[in-house]
């Protein structure tokens, strides 16, 4: 009915669309938005005005309350905080101590903190990393009195302040901040390194405070806005300045001959910008300051000539050392004793002999060479009798041991073994025994040392010590076996030492005859006891015909059981026995069997004669004894 009354709802319904359209267009400013809102307010007429105002008032109050609470939440939760729980969790993550005071390093970089707080319990910190955060102020570091390094680069700092508690601070990094003036650093008595790169420093007044930093050695002012060349007047008053970086500042272009000028004015500078200041560079810069480019060129030439001479002298000294070493080697080869270095004249090349020595340089070279040889002699002393070593002759070889042979010369006789004894291996009729003999002969060609000789318990039949050769006092046991009887047993016969008095003792020991080999390849060597029994048989026949009553009742070979043998050896030794004729052997010998002679008792003369005829044929018995011994094993 009334169109005016119907229009406000339409306009009010269209109001959000207007606001949305204004919000969608980013170019539309707040003035446009306010005009649209005012237009919509003007459209509210009649009875709807009060209703609209009543609706807008509570909505405005709610909006202000919501904005206040939202700003308060932003202030409280706008980023991570350095809470105690967070710090403990961080220490656990980095495998640090859970007890705060025990930690000396704390890594708080790249965490997004906007302020420094809750570090009161971390009193033992020596290094604190706070780089790459949003910190706007240096504060709350009163408990860190032991701090040495503080890293605050890449933050939002505008001022240097609150560093008085850090009396032991050595390195401070404030790069990539918004600091315009260097200040409040004189309270740090041991500050050694200050990094102020990428800040807002511009004038000499901004760095004037550096005059009070007496212990500062490393200063980085790169990539600032310093343009006044008078900054050098401030820098040259710093007594300990060694490293300076001014790269990225306009002042490097405003100072003529920048590097030479800075090097000359800063007397103790050792590193400028991106490279060191060498002594040669400083000397050339000072020469340039005195006489320009010509003086600099002359000074550079002198330095180059000195460096070249130094290299040449070192090469000559090395050549002299090599030459003297060759002379000493030749003198040793000729058998001459080389003179000590102090008595020697300086052997040089013909060119050096023609030229006189060059004073101090030559003396330095000589002293260097002498010191080199003295050091070599101390490390590797030469023995005067290095090539003269006493040796113990074994066949055609020598057992070389200088130290032992000198001590053994007074206590024992030298071990001398004839080549026949060394090369007399065990031989046999079969081919396998010959191969073993050749192998043994090859093994004996190796050098033998006294330390390699076995102990007395390890002596074989072929390896006998000196005591076995010189001392042979025990009662020998002779094992006699008939080689023609298949069922012959081991016989043990003990003879006194007086029986063997006339027999020469083999130098290889009492048991060496067991392993000795006969050199006669005839058939007689294959029957061990045939040659022994032949002379004894003839002597038996003669003695029987002369004195038949002297025949002994004891057999030639006495058979002993194992029990009797052990009892006899344990209780008392068997008495000496004389040979008697065996009936079986006698009958076989009378029947014309020359291989089985009979034995008869021998008198003193017959005994000596039999013994003298017995031992020349020992090699034939040794084979049989060896075979029986191996057979018993």
Curated annotation (Swiss-Prot):
The record's subcellular location field reads: Cell projection, Cilium
Keyword Repeat assigned: yes
| Residues with Phosphoserine modification | 349, 465, 488
Residue windows of the LRR repeats:
101-123, 124-145, 146-167, 168-189, 190-211, 215-236
Q: Name one GO molecular function term.
A: dynein complex binding
Query: Which keywords describe this protein according to UniProt?
Result: Cell projection, Cilium, Leucine-rich repeat, Phosphoprotein, Repeat
Query: A single GO CC term, please?
Result: axoneme
According to the entry, every stretch annotated as the LRRCT domain falls at 249-288
Compositional bias, Basic and acidic residues, is annotated for: 22-42, 70-80, 326-344, 352-364
Task: Tell me which InterPro entries the record gives.
Answer: Cilia_flagella_integrity, Leu-rich_rpt, LRR_dom_sf
State the source organism's domain of life.
Eukaryota
Biased composition of type Polar residues is found at: 538-555, 568-592
Task: Indicate where the modification Phosphothreonine is found in the sequence.
Answer: 462
Give the family, as the similarity comment puts it.
Belongs to the DNAAF1 family.
- What name does the UniProt record give this protein? Dynein axonemal assembly factor 1
Organism this protein belongs to: Rattus norvegicus (Rat)
Q: Which gene is transcribed and translated to give this protein?
A: Dnaaf1
